[in-house]
Amino acid sequence: MTYSSQLLEMRKVEQILDWSQLIFRKEKTMTRVTSAANDEILVVSADSLLTNNITNNKTYKKKILHNKKIIIALLGQIELITSNGIIEFDKVIENIIKQEINPYLVENQIIQTVEKYFSKYYNKNFLQVCLFWRENQHFLLRAFQLNGDYKIMPFLNYAFGYDYKTKDNVIKVMNHYYFDTGEGAGNHLLGFLNTNPLDFSIQTVRNAINNTDFQTVGGDVFTVTLDKHGI
């Protein structure tokens, strides 16, 4: 099924169905982070399975981090194995958001810190970051990729909602939209949301976990919600 035909099928569905049947079929690269919002609440959900792409060993870890104002979902290479030990990017980023709540400063610190490790211990893999926050009654999303080749590679090149303080599709308004990753943030499904964000987000991830075709999705559903008061 092509990407355009997937989107066409999605538009035909008005209630929560088994969305995982419509989204990306390459089992070995599958991961799942789903976000959805209306005007009152933003919900981000993820599975908790991590699969080592060399040994195929499976471990479990939360892929969503947060402070009182920001939600961050991680995809791709969350851990970097080096001669000096294992660098856990989730712990690196968690330390950043413990000290900073401004999303723009958080983004800059993540880029500077993670790129420092990638440039020192170069490899071909990458870390993708989905950054969510609320500003002026808008729930906002910024998604980008970090690796040894690019300082920053923004995603969200398919227009949805409308741009926020930008002309180049790098920050998106999530109100009444969903954002669902298949093979990472750069290969995603998105569209208009006409149902409850909490139900949609949780059920989408749960369906992917229960789908035996998706061998790298598993564990429990982890969910974080953000409203006008924070998290």
Question: Where do the model's predicted regions map?
Answer:
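Acidic, low-complexity central loop/insert segments
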Residues: 144-145, 155
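Structural motif
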Residues: 138-140
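Short hydrophobic alpha-helical segments used for membrane anchoring or interfacial signaling
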Residues: 130-136, 224-227
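Conserved short S/T/G-enriched processing/targeting/catalytic segments and their helical context
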Residues: 7, 29-125, 150-230
